[in-house]
Design a protein with these regions (language model features):
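Sequence/structural signature of beta-propeller domains
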Residues: 17-352
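Positively charged n-region of N-terminal signal peptides that target proteins for export
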Residues: 1-5
Length: 352
């Protein structure tokens, strides 16, 4: 699709959303849910991107992988306690792929972006729950990545990393093995405009969802064989249902199989959930509860709707909290059941 065609479509969408907003008027305040736990503060006050690794046998032993800026990658248990810190790199974004084929072994592949080096480093998670770096050449990005997600093609089984650059490009790398080393090659670059940041992919449909700080939430095909035509999920105010700054984006499948996209509506200090038809189907905010403070300024988020022990029978939502009451920022852990109930969403089921 040409830039002119895209702009014409976007203009039409903006006009339609503006008319809808004017007709609907002011919306009620979203329901509040309290975080069940919080992680230890980040070492260098850099809570940013976050990912969840689901333990294959025991969901209660799952891990939270938090990008802690200059403090490196910080690994937490579901109780929020720090289990491991990888501090020989800086970390701004992290993503996890399950079942990556390394010499005939299926392993979790963890990709971490180091903004100081502008490189993507590969790690895996051992049976003991510890992360270790894999051999191979780190990906050298041409620009700072302000968003990172990953995708496994349901057709070819190939694994990809997708990075949103500060310069307004979506870079897509295919990951593969050469002996015991993990390597990658750039397979495409798609202009998405400055402002595109956090992202997530629905593997089943091959749809990349990303937040654009100024525009709203957008989608485009993640498949390298498909024309990267963008579509609008929702727009920022005053033409859509989002505030002026969109940050983290997460994804789960509903119990009926429909995709649900969870978005950090940062300027409004709230979170929105979208269904396949577009437009928000639920909203909530994260308030104080017990010894855990409310979430204020937030950026990255991750969600996994799979049982994770008695405390989290439907999984968890994890969000970065730059306004943590402690000295440094941290990550808040919310039961997914509590979050979706607050948002008025029916039961959801994990699908990867």
């Amino acid at each position: 699709m040409t830039n002119r065609a895209w702009l014409l479509l976007l203009s039409a969408a903006l006009s339609a959303c503006a008319q809808k907003s004017a007709e609907e008027g002011a919306e009620p305040a979203p329901a509040t849910v309290a975080a069940a736990a919080e992680t230890a503060p980040t070492a260098q006050d850099g809570a940013n991107g976050v990912a969840i690794w689901v333990h294959p046998q025991d969901g209660a032993r799952s891990l939270i992988l938090g990008a802690g800026g200059t403090g490196g990658l910080e690994v937490y248990g579901l109780d929020g306690a720090l289990r491991q810190r990888i501090d020989d790199i800086e970390a701004s974004h992290v993503t996890v792929r399950y079942g990556f084929d390394l010499g005939g072994r299926r392993i979790p592949l963890v990709l971490v972006f180091d903004p100081m080096r502008s490189q993507l480093f590969p790690y895996t998670i051992g049976d003991d729950g510890r992360l270790s770096r894999l051999s191979g050449t780190p990906v050298q990005a041409d620009d700072d990545l302000v968003g990172l997600c990953s995708y496994t093609s349901p057709v070819s089984g190939r694994v990809y990393a997708l990075g949103m650059t500060d310069g307004g490009q979506m870079l897509q790398w295919e990951y593969f093995t050469k002996g015991d080393a993990v390597e990658a090659r750039l397979v495409r670059s798609v202009p998405v405009g400055k402002g595109a940041e956090y992202c997530v992919v629905d593997d089943a449909s091959g749809t990349l969802y990303y937040g654009d700080e100024a525009l709203g939430v957008m989608a485009l095909p993640a498949s390298v064989e498909t024309d990267p035509a963008r579509t609008v999920v929702d727009l920022a105010a005053p033409r859509g249902g989002l505030a002026a700054e969109v940050k983290g984006v997460g994804f789960v499948h509903g119990a009926d199989g429909r995709p649900l996209v969870v978005v950090t509506d940062a300027s409004a200090e709230r979170f929105a959930i979208y269904g396949p038809e577009g437009g928000p189907i639920g909203r909530f905010q994260i308030g104080a509860g017990g010894a855990v403070d409310a979430v204020g300024e937030s950026e990255g988020l991750a969600v996994a709707a799979v049982p994770m022990g008695e405390a989290y029978p439907e999984g968890i939502l994890v969000v970065a909290d730059q306004d943590n009451d402690g000295e440094h920022s941290n990550f808040k852990i919310v039961g997914w059941r509590e979050a979706r109930v607050a948002a008025g969403i029916a039961d959801t089921a994990f699908a990867d």
